[in-house]
Structures are given as C-alpha cells and as structure tokens.
C-alpha cells in the first residue's frame, strides 16, 4: 500500500528531469551561458566570466525551471573535442547551440558543426535553441541575421528558435530557458 501512495505522490509532486546539451564551437560562450543560467535560477553566483577557462570534456549544471529539473551538459567545442558530442545525443531531450554573434569569421565553422549535429539520428525531433550570444558586444549580429546566415534547411520539421542573448550580462537567458522547458514538456 505504501508503494502505491509513494508512486502517486511522486507522480503528483516530483519534477521531471530533462537533459539538455549545450553545444557550439570553441569560444562561443557555452560555459559562460551555463554559469549565468545557474545564477539566474538560483541564489548562488556562478563563476565570473573572467575566470572561466576553455572546457576540456564536460561541465554539468542543474537548475529548476517551472515544474522541471534541467540537467545541462556543456561540452567542449574545440575541433578535437567535437567527436565526443555524439556520446551524449541519445539521452538528450533538447539542444542549445551557442554561436558567438560578434565573430562572423567563425560563422561557417559554427554552421558546419551545427549541420553535423542536426544530421545525427539520435537527435531527430529534439527541440533546438540557437543562441546568438555576445549581444553585449556592439558588433554582434541579431538573431535574425544569424538565422539568415546559417540558412538551415533541416529546421523546417524541427521545433526550434533563434534567440539573441548575452551570457555575460544575462540578456535573454530567462526567456530562452522558459521557451526550452515549455517545448520539452510538450514533446
């Protein structure tokens, strides 16, 4: 009898745990984004941006948004580390792809990496949030400009959104996370 009530209690009151990959080429601001999300959704200050070093392997972060627990897997974006990304695809409920919107010379590399991610069968149907990061830098292109440049044909059948954010000052972070939770809870 206890297990029946426990199961019912757990069903009614526990939060759904969702796994989100944070991907992008090196220096896009993935770890800064993760640290800013942690500080926005908790009372704990994340690592200051000037103390963040390039990710070699994986950083894990956890936050609670609405009725969900989000577990973020922030993976290193250097060319030699991108081969490990696919080891995390099968368990991912969504993907955040971060692009440094202030550095157009790296858009082609970002587009190539993103297209490879989108082709993988384990991520078919996973919601995709593409972030035009570093909006605090005057030279950054808008989310619409980035979307036109990336010109991703495969997005037609996928739930996706482009959003302009600044992982440095937090602009757009809360809206992005709330959109992601909403679409993951529906799928």
Please identify what each model-predicted range represents.
Residues 1-187:
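TRAFAC-class small GTPase G-domain
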